[in-house]
A protein has these predicted regions:
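Conserved N-terminal phosphate-binding loop of PLP-dependent enzymes in the Aspartate aminotransferase
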Residues: 1-247
Length: 247
């Protein structure tokens, strides 16, 4: 009830787990079940965890070493102001060119069985890479036009770390699937997958259960940390310090 109250849009279906990687794997299964397709796209230098599926969506050499990627996992370049691939005449990032590349990549490098995108709102292990403000709104629009789903891995960026419950709120974007962790349990092993209302039944088809996920103690810890964030105005505090740091 608390999550449905504070999360944006129609994110109203929830399943609880005990690690970020497990939540990511569950989110990937939701994408497949909801879309009835299998391929997924992430970005170079993303990090989503260290189990087989999550590793296949990542680009960290130490995590991938000695492991074979799951077929159907693709990576594309991410807008990066430090090393942009495409820019406008004024030197700003040409987001439209990135989106056009994604469209061309899907057409020529996949088997046309793409479920959607799985991305970090702000890249963590890849170097704290912040996207241009128009990137996720345009990617959301592209996904809607092409019938693709958008999953935001907010394990690192969510739960107040950027001054919002979800980092995606900064751009007014509601993902179809969101993974939440780390600050969610404030050190306690509590994570969550949140999905938009049309996809809640996908939890049933993927047997979305976990031996320890959602146990009463973990849920109590997550609820308590959430209430502290609210009561002590920690969202506003993080946003204020973030603005100062970016200066």
């Amino acid at each position: 009830e608390k999550l449905a109250e504070i999360l944006p849009g129609d994110l109203s279906g929830f399943q609880f787990y005990d690690s970020g990687t497990t939540a990511v794997e569950a989110g990937m299964r939701v994408l497949r079940a909801a879309s009835k397709r299998n391929e997924m796209i992430s970005c170079f230098y993303d990090y989503h965890g260290k189990t087989q599926g999550a590793v296949s969506l990542g680009h960290i050499r130490s995590a991938v070493y000695g492991s074979t990627r799951v077929p159907g996992m693709h990576m594309v370049p991410r807008p990066d102001a430090y090393r942009p691939l495409w820019t406008k005449p004024d030197g700003s990032i040409d987001t439209d060119r990135y989106i056009a590349f994604y469209d061309e990549y899907i057409d020529k490098a996949t088997v046309h069985d793409v479920a959607g995108f799985v991305l970090e709102p702000i890249q963590g292990w890849g170097g704290s890479v912040m996207p241009p403000d128009d990137f996720f709104p345009k990617l959301r629009r592209y996904c809607d036009e092409k019938g693709l789903l958008l999953m935001a891995d907010e394990v690192l960026t969510g739960w107040g770390r950027t001054g919002k419950w979800l980092c995606m709120e900064h751009w007014g974007v509601v993902p179809d699937v969101v993974t939440i962790g780390k600050g969610f349990g404030n050190g306690f092993p509590a994570t969550c997958v949140a999905v938009r209302e049309p996809y809640t039944k996908s939890f049933e088809s993927i047997s979305a259960s976990s031996s320890y996920g959602g146990n009463p103690m973990a849920c109590a810890a997550a609820l308590a940390s959430t209430e502290v964030i609210e009561e002590e105005n920690l969202l506003e505090h993080a946003e204020r310090l973030g603005e100062l740091a970016l200066q």
